[in-house]
C-alpha cells in the first residue's frame, strides 16, 4: 500500500469545499478555522502512519513545529498521540487565551530551525504552514528529519508562493511582487501585515520543496494538501503546480 492510499480516499471534492469555506474565519474566528484544520490534519497524519506502518498512530510521539496556541494539540490528543509543540513566538503560544490553557500536550519555546531535541527522538515530526514564514525553510526541514526516528514520518506542508493564497492577508496583490504587495497593504491599513513579506513571509516555490525533499533521499510522497484526489496530478507538472497546487505536502521517512 502506498503511504497516501488511505488518505486519498478521504480527499474528496466535498472535503476540499468544506475546508475552503472555513478559510474566511481565520481572522475573525481563529478557533473555528484552526479547529477544523487541526481535525483534518490529525486525520491526515493518522492515515499516513497507518498506511506506512500498518498500525494505529495512538501511543506515538509527535512533534509539531510551529504549533501555535494548541489547537492541534487537542486534535492529536483525541487520536491518542503524545503531542509536543514547538513555537518561537510567545504571542502565538498564548493566542487562544484561556480556551487552551492547561490543555493536552507539552510546549517548548524554540525555533524550528534549531530544534532543542536529540536526534531520532520522535515518531512523527509535523510542520503545518510554517516553512513559508521562515527565511531558511530547508534548514527547518533538515531539523525535522534529524529528530525523527528511522522509519518514522516527517510531514512538511507549506503554502506555495505563486498559489492564490501565497500572499496570505495581502490577497492576490502578491502577484505584483512581494515587496510591492507589502507596501500596498501597509498604505491601505496603516500597519504592516502580520505575514509581512521579507520578514515573516517568504516566497517558497513547489519546485524548491520537491528538489530539497528528493535530495534528502527520504521523500515517499508529495501531493496538494487541500485538493481532491483527482487533482493530485498537478504536483508533477512544472510551472502549473506553482499556481494551482496552493499547499504542498512533503512526506518523508528517515532511514
From Swiss-Prot:
GTP-binding among keywords: no
CDD domains: AdoMet_MTases
GO MF assignments: S-adenosylmethionine-dependent methyltransferase activity
One BP term from GO: methylation
Gene3D superfamilies recorded: Vaccinia Virus protein VP39
Enzyme nomenclature, EC number: 2.1.1.-
Transmembrane in keyword set: no
SUPFAM superfamilies: S-adenosyl-L-methionine-dependent methyltransferases (SSF53335)
Keywords associated with the record: Methyltransferase, Transferase
Name this polypeptide is given: Uncharacterized methyltransferase MUL_1123
UniProt organism field: Mycobacterium ulcerans (strain Agy99)
Amino acid at each position: 500500500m502506498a503511504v497516501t492510499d488511505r488518505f486519498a480516499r478521504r480527499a474528496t471534492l466535498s472535503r476540499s469545499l468544506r475546508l475552503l469555506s472555513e478559510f474566511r474565519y481565520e481572522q475573525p474566528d481563529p478557533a473555528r478555522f484552526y479547529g477544523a484544520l487541526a481535525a483534518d490534519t490529525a486525520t491526515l497524519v493518522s492515515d499516513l502512519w497507518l498506511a506506512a506502518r500498518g498500525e494505529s498512530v495512538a501511543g506515538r510521539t509527535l512533534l509539531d513545529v510551529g504549533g501555535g496556541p494548541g489547537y492541534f494539540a487537542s486534535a492529536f490528543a483525541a487520536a491518542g498521540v503524545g503531542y509536543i509543540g514547538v513555537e518561537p513566538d510567545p504571542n502565538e503560544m498564548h493566542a487562544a487565551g484561556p480556551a487552551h490553557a492547561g490543555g493536552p500536550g507539552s510546549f517548548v519555546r524554540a525555533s524550528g530551525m534549531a530544534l532543542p531535541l536529540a536526534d531520532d527522538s520522535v515518531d512523527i515530526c509535523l510542520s503545518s504552514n510554517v516553512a513559508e514564514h521562515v527565511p531558511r525553510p530547508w534548514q527547518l526541514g533538515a531539523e525535522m528529519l534529524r529528530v525523527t526516528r528511522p522509519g518514522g514520518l516527517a510531514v512538511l506542508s507549506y503554502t506555495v508562493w505563486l498559489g492564490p493564497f501565497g500572499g496570505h492577508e495581502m490577497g492576490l496583490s502578491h502577484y505584483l511582487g512581494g515587496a510591492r504587495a507589502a507596501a500596498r497593504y501597509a498604505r491601505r491599513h496603516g500597519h504592516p501585515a502580520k505575514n509581512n513579506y521579507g520578514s515573516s513571509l517568504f516566497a517558497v516555490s513547489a519546485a524548491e520543496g520537491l528538489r530539497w525533499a528528493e535530495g534528502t533521499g527520504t521523500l515517499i510522497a508529495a501531493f496538494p494538501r487541500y485538493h481532491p484526489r483527482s487533482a493530485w496530478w498537478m504536483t508533477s507538472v512544472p510551472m502549473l503546480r506553482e499556481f494551482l497546487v496552493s499547499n504542498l505536502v512533503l512526506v518523508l521517512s528517515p532511514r
